């Protein structure tokens, strides 16, 4: 399950395979379906079914993870994602192949 979060920029998501359920609307999104989320959108979703859920997602801005009261608990953006990638490479004795943002 992807925890409740808010996007500060646009989101474009294309389901490649599998299904996911949007928690607040109970909408099911399947293979070949494109979803646009405007800046400020808050959502949560989970993969459903037996097939792996593979989604191509392009985001701009930050992804802010929220607690039950709507307070930001942490965030992800280009810089935090790159730092996590770099740390993973170091932990596995690999040289990063992507440049810093």
Task: State where each predicted segment sits.
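Hydrophobic pocket/interface hotspot
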Residues: 15, 32, 55
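Double-stranded beta-helix
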Residues: 44, 48-101
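Short, conserved beta-strand element in jelly-roll/cupin
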Residues: 1, 5-21, 58-60
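Short histidine-centered beta-strand/loop micro-motifs
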Residues: 2-7, 24-27, 45-48
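Short acidic-glycine-tyrosine-enriched beta hairpin
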Residues: 12, 20-44
